[in-house]
Amino acid sequence: MQRHMLKSKIHRAAVTHCELHYEGSCAIDEDLLEAANIVENERIDIWNINNGERFSTYAIKGERGSGMISLNGSAARRAQLGDLVIIAAFAMIDEQELKAGWKPDLVFVDEDNKIKGSRDHVPTQNWT
């Protein structure tokens, strides 16, 4: 059996550009793509923390070290400059990989979309 699992996440990145008339996609700083294990043309889901919008597009490379998160084409209508977003990618993982210890790549960024940390799991949520 295979399970549809979170593979990659860039958490709380700020939108730096909205390019309505650019060919659709989301341009992401190449440093962030590599850290999160997202490849060019991979399908990504984007969740806008500010307005609750959730949509899918695909990733393209943004300038390395720029902190770029550019929503292009129709995706540009889903956010404003400065909105915080979560960018996620999913993969089909088989039971053997899961039992062998497969983990996702989670990347956390600062206010300039520079990497401030990474993890391979989401901590258990507590009620305290």
Curated annotation (Swiss-Prot):
The active site is at S25, Y58. It is an enzyme of class 4 (lyase). CDD domains: Asp_decarbox. It comes from the Bacteria. Pathway: Cofactor biosynthesis; (R)-pantothenate biosynthesis; beta-alanine from L-aspartate: step 1/1. InterPro entries: Asp_de-COase-like_dom_sf (IPR009010), Asp_decarbox (IPR003190). It catalyses: L-aspartate + H(+) = beta-alanine + CO2. Its EC number is 4.1.1.11. GO terms for molecular function: aspartate 1-decarboxylase activity. Substrate binds at T57, G73, S74, A75. Binds 1 pyruvoyl group covalently per subunit. The modification Pyruvic acid (Ser) is found at S25. This is Aspartate 1-decarboxylase. It comes from Burkholderia pseudomallei (strain 668). The lineage of its organism: Bacteria, Pseudomonadati, Pseudomonadota, Betaproteobacteria, Burkholderiales. The gene is panD.
